[in-house]
């Protein structure tokens, strides 16, 4: 690389994608700076998204577990916790994550520049520092990893004290008794679980005809049932006509003619790339209507020396994938090509209560493809470990080819689903005949474990063959 620039590469953003790119670059000997607009590294994932929402979910699920355990069935012992209490738990996790990630940059001698950056030309950034001063920095190459933020439609007043998005909900100052959640995607469903777990009434407004339609239908139906069973009111195929903030809450007028009122509204319908402040017009780069950039297989934009990773390029918009994208982009940036690539079957983890996780094809996809598959199931209620810990709700489903026994998809609903899925994923990734459902029959599992569900499901599926 040329050394006529201030840096070999500048990474804009310190979330998972930016961190992956920065660490990949410094490990290859590049002179790297990371620009972060906030005082702490970690990006939205650490401070407003993945980490705090999962910490909230964990605290609420433990309260539910305690209150439903027959050992503690005396009602005088029921646990109660305020939203402020569980937010404090989330804050402690955020602080630990921030300290750890700051250490990554320090140990690897990667410089952190704080401020808001925008492009002056194709190799120059203007950096507006927090004290109001403006500096310019240059680099041969760039990685845009500035993430995304909640989408704000113009006709919704997000300045109203009772109207929140998925970032500002973490600053909730009151204890709601009733919440409307608009948008039944992953974020909306996760927060529906959290609020209902705290005994808050929830109206979940879904603009589509079923929850999380990308999931295997049995998983989607299971979530719908558990929401119904816990008291969440789901309204499918609805869109808002008007959202009205009033003194004591929010009134939502739906296009179907219905009206809903609640203490507050969580608007969780879509996200927008954080590209509007980068002055991309100065370098001729264009985004789509949601502020996202198009990239090639090596994460290069229309300008070959500028790369983009993470939420700012859209699908799959997962923290796990963003980190890998950053590492791949770093390899391509230094070497001109990347030997690594994002895996074809990226696992999905949805942290509702209970969790949902999947990898590979759904039954609906395999049916449409006319693949001769069979299904093996294990119900958690039949597993000794689940009975011991009192988590009997859930199922593991394995889809496999009837003739070759190749595993085609795995779907899990229940506590620890996002962990359990990786056992099956590891087998699915095996080459040369290693991907076979018979592995689970011929392997000895620890007993009692949740992992034993794979053996039960494999036997169940193989017994269906004739």
Swiss-Prot record:
Cofactor-binding details, from the entry: Binds 1 FAD per subunit.
- Entry's EC annotation: 1.6.1.1
Among InterPro entries, the record links this protein to: Class-I_Pyr_Nuc-Dis_Oxidored, FAD/NAD-bd_sf, FAD/NAD-binding_dom, FAD/NAD-linked_Rdtase_dimer_sf, Pyr_nuc-diS_OxRdtase, Pyr_nucl-diS_OxRdtase_dimer, STH_gammaproteobact
Query: GO MF terms on file?
Result: dihydrolipoyl dehydrogenase (NADH) activity; flavin adenine dinucleotide binding; NAD(P)+ transhydrogenase (Si-specific) activity
Q: Which keywords accompany this UniProt record?
A: Cytoplasm, FAD, Flavoprotein, NAD, NADP, Oxidoreductase
Q: Where in the cell is it found?
A: Cytoplasm
One protein family per Pfam: Pyr_redox_dim
Tell me which cofactor or cofactors this protein depends on. Answer: FAD
Please give the catalytic activity noted in the UniProt record: NAD(+) + NADPH = NADH + NADP(+)
Q: Name one GO biological process term.
A: NADP metabolic process
* One Gene Ontology term, aspect cellular component: cytosol
The entry's FAD-binding residues are 36-45
PANTHER family xrefs: DISULFIDE OXIDOREDUCTASE, SOLUBLE PYRIDINE NUCLEOTIDE TRANSHYDROGENASE
According to its UniProt entry, what is the function of this protein? Conversion of NADPH, generated by peripheral catabolic pathways, to NADH, which can enter the respiratory chain for energy generation.
Q: What is this protein called?
A: Soluble pyridine nucleotide transhydrogenase
Q: Which organism is it from?
A: Klebsiella pneumoniae subsp. pneumoniae (strain ATCC 700721 / MGH 78578)
Task: From the UniProt record, report the name of the gene that encodes this protein.
Answer: sthA
